[in-house]
Amino acid sequence: MKRTYVGPSGNREAKLGCCGEQPGVQEVRASPPRPFVGPAGQGMDECLQMTRIPRLEMYLTNVIKDLDAPLSHYINLTSQGKYTISKEGYQYIQGLGEELKSLDLNVIVAFGNIALIALTNRVGITKWRGSVLESTIVPGLKVVPTFHPATFIPPKFNFLNKPLICEDLLRAKYESEFKEIRRTRRNIRIKRGFRESVDTLNYCYEIGLRGQTIDIDIEVINGEVDCIAFAWSPTD
């Protein structure tokens, strides 16, 4: 039998939800116990205020619902990006799926790597944050991963995560307005020849002089530039 348990809270009719990792001491001691009322919850509230998202209109939950054991007991994530899930961890993930299937959410925000793993079976919050993914435990449910609010408060103090969380919350707010997953069609051209590459660089230079923004993505492997990508519009 569990010594501690913190169930979900919020609006069960909501279109937008947030999923954290595990309750903390303040959540367990709250009366009644509920998620996101500790320091990380206060950080989340600050982000919600900045993005004008009413907390009362959201559904809030966690992957792990107790504080009987450390998070790594349920889902253990290594520094190499590998993870293992215990039997109890699988039970919680399965329960989360049933919980979310009973709702009518359009999108849920995954706070942190553990929520990302549970909801999408993916790992790498820095890589996936801000993306719109489909949940693997609730088909059709959109998931927007972002950093956990605990990352920008003591003791971690990663202050730059706060505006990124706000940006991702705004993305989730927009996605909550409709059910379907909308994909942008992109024209991607790869393995360009020398002449085509020079022409592309000249084109980027010319439109850059006219004030158009050029996005550049540089991939570095073992300290050497492996490839460079240029984008001059959301589709090209």
Language-model region placement:
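A polyanion-binding, active-site-adjacent surface
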Residues: 1-182
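Conserved RNase H-like, two-metal-ion catalytic cores of nucleic-acid enzymes
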Residues: 31-35, 41-45, 51, 183-236
